[in-house]
Amino acid sequence: SIISHREEIFNDKQSLFGKLFGILILFLLVAPGVISNESAKTSIAPLMLWVFLWIGVPVLGLLFGDIYAKFNPLNLFPVSSNKPQSVYFACVLFIGLTWFELVWRKPGNPLNIGVVFMLLFISVNLLRYFLKKSLIEVDPLLLLHYLYSKLKLINSRPYFRSLLDNIGNLARLRGIEYFVLLMIG
């Protein structure tokens, strides 16, 4: 039998700087479309979403660990929650984000990006507040970036050993296999 180190699944504490950066990110995603209705060619919202959040942060997470959790724009309010049990809500919200990206007409439109992120922000925080869910159970972007960070390329321990430990720790969350399949698909 192999005894492996078990770590805390997730800690959602943010520094003041992280919260301020998260507010800035949320503002840059929502304001250009909702407040000023900028065109997609001149707006920063599509750049923030498609280049920074979908590509840049996961690549940085592969190198430096879970940096998205440090400034998560959906984690602005402190909410007491239970220990993470499942990620089914995150799976459903991830399907919604994927539908927005692949099916919805004009996913690069700043107004559409603003509306989607306002809905995501409200959904995540209502689930956290009323159902006492932990952030990693309901935030699909956090779970996505967290999974990428668990594949971290730079480790002080042997790579495959730490990768197996990380995967073993994640297996305790019900529904994680569905989220991984959605992520791959």
Mark where each language-model region is.
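Transmembrane-helix bundle segments that line or gate the permeation/cavity pathway
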Residues: S1-G185
